[in-house]
Amino acid sequence: MSDFMTEQEFRIEHDTMGEVKVPAKALWQAQTQRAVENFPISGRGLESAQIRAMGLLKAACAQVNKDSGALDAEKADAIIAAGKEIASGKHDAEFPIDVFQTGSGTSSNMNTNEVIASIAKANGVEVHPNDHVNMGQSSNDTFPTATHVAATEAAVNDLIPGLKVLHESLAKKANEWSEVVKSGRTHLMDAVPVTLGQEFGGYARQIQLGIERVEATLPRLGELAIGGTAAGTGINTSADFGGKVVAELINLTDVKELKEAENHFEAQAARDALVEFSGAMRVIAVSLYKIANDIRLMGSGPLTGLGEIRLPDLQPGSSIMPGKVNPVLCETATQVSAQVIGNDAAVAFSGTQGQFELNVFIPVMARNVLESARLLANTSRVFATRLVDGIEPNEAHMKELAESSPSIVTPLNSAIGYEAAAKVAKTALAEGKTIRQTVIDLGLVDGEKLTEEELDKRLDVLAMAHTERENKF
C-alpha cells in the first residue's frame, strides 16, 4: 500500500521495529499498518460484533484501571469514550486487518489500541496504545475475551430471539393445520397419512431443541479469559482485575451470562466453548436444511410437482421463462445451512490448535462462529416472516393424494392379514383403483372379519393420522 502513497497521502508512525508509512487520515498506527501489509489474504476482516466487543472491553479495562488509581482519570475517560465510539460501529472502517493474521489476534488487539489512542489524541488527550490502552492486558486474554463477549451477545441478543420467531411461526402453523390430512412419506415413498400440522409440529420441535442447545452452551461460552494476561498467570495485573472487568462488561452489554473464567489456563489455551457453540449451530443448520427442503418439495410444481402447499410469490424466478416463481427463501436457507456446516468444520479443527498455553487459531474461529450466528439469526427471521407465515395448504389435493396412497391399506392388516393387505395395495396400484374398491372387488368384505362399515372406518385417512399421544413442539 505504502509504495503507491504520495507525500500528501501518508504520515510517518513508528513502533519498536522502526518507522512505517501510514495513510494520512487513518486512525490506526504503525503495528496495524504492518499487519495490513503482511496479511493481504482474503479481504475479509473481523466481524462487526467482534470490533464492538473489543471497544467495550477496552472501555471496561480503562474504567477498572481508573478506579484502582493505576490510570489517571483524564486518560481513562478518553479511552472509555473512544472504546464506546468503536463499539457504536462508527469506526469499523478503521479495522482493516485480514481475519487470516497472527493466530492470537495480536494484530487486531493492537489495531484497537492504536485507534483508541488516535481518537483520544484527536480529543486532546495523549495516551499510549500499550502503556495506557492495553494496561493490565495481553492480546492473549483480550482477544479471546472479546470473542466470547461477541459470541455470547450474538447468542443471547440475536440468535435465540431469531430462532424463537421461527419456532413461533412453525408452531402456529402446526396448530392451524392439525386437521389437514396428507400422505406421509418415508424414503420419499408414499406412507401412512399424517397431518400437515404434525409435520410442522416436528419442524417447530427441531427449532425449539436448537434453542435449548444454544442456551445450554451459555455457561461455558460466557466465561471470559480477561485477567490471565500473557499465559494465564495474570502477570502484570492484579488478581481482582479480571472479575472487575467482567462486572463492567456486564454493565455495558447487559449480558448477565458473562463471568470470569473459572480456570484462566483453560480459558486461554483451549477454545472448547466456541467449538461447543459452533456445534450447536451446526445442528440448527442441519435442522433448517431439512425443514427448508421439505417445504420446497411440498411446494414444488405448480403442475408437475407435489403441489401440496402454495409458497408466497416473492420475486420473478427466471430471466427467460415468464411467470416462473422459485422457492428462493428455501434455497437461501439451505445455502446458509451449508455455510454454517462448513464454518463449523473450520471451527472444530481450529479448536485442536491450542498448543500449551494458547490457542493460535482464534481469529478464524471468531469470524466463523460470529458469521454462523448472524446467518442463522437473520435467516430464521426472514424464513418465518416472509415464507412460513404466508404458506397456504392445498387441502383438497393433499387429501386426494392421501386417500390414493397404497399405504392406507396398513390399518387392514389386523382384519385381513399382511399378505392379503399387500395384495390389495399392489392390485390397486396396478389397476388404478382406490384401496376401498379393490378390497371389495377381491371379496375381502365378508361380513365377519371385515364389514363395509368397518372398512370405511379403517380407511378414514384423518383418523389414521390422529394419535393418542401428545407431541410437544
Swiss-Prot record:
Catalytic residue positions: H187 (proton donor/acceptor), S318
GO function term, MF aspect, one: fumarate hydratase activity
The keyword Lyase appears for this protein: yes
Annotated EC: 4.2.1.2
Keywords assigned: Cytoplasm, Lyase, Tricarboxylic acid cycle
Residues that coordinate or bind substrate: 104-106, 128-131, 138-140, 186, 319, 324-326
Coiled coil (UniProt feature): none
A biological process from GO: fumarate metabolic process
InterPro entries on file: Fum_hydII, Fumarase/histidase_N, Fumarase_C_C, Fumarate_lyase_CS, Fumarate_lyase_fam, Fumarate_lyase_N, L-Aspartase-like
Family matches, as CDD domains: Fumarase_classII
Site (Important for catalytic activity): E331
Reactions the enzyme catalyzes: (S)-malate = fumarate + H2O
Subunit text: Homotetramer.
Additional remark text: There are 2 substrate-binding sites: the catalytic A site, and the non-catalytic B site that may play a role in the transfer of substrate or product between the active site and the solvent. Alternatively, the B site may bind allosteric effectors.
Listed PANTHER family: ASPARTATEAMMONIA/ARGININOSUCCINATE/ADENYLOSUCCINATE LYASE, FUMARATE HYDRATASE CLASS II
Protein name, per record: Fumarate hydratase class II
Organism: Corynebacterium glutamicum (strain ATCC 13032 / DSM 20300 / JCM 1318 / BCRC 11384 / CCUG 27702 / LMG 3730 / NBRC 12168 / NCIMB 10025 / NRRL B-2784 / 534)
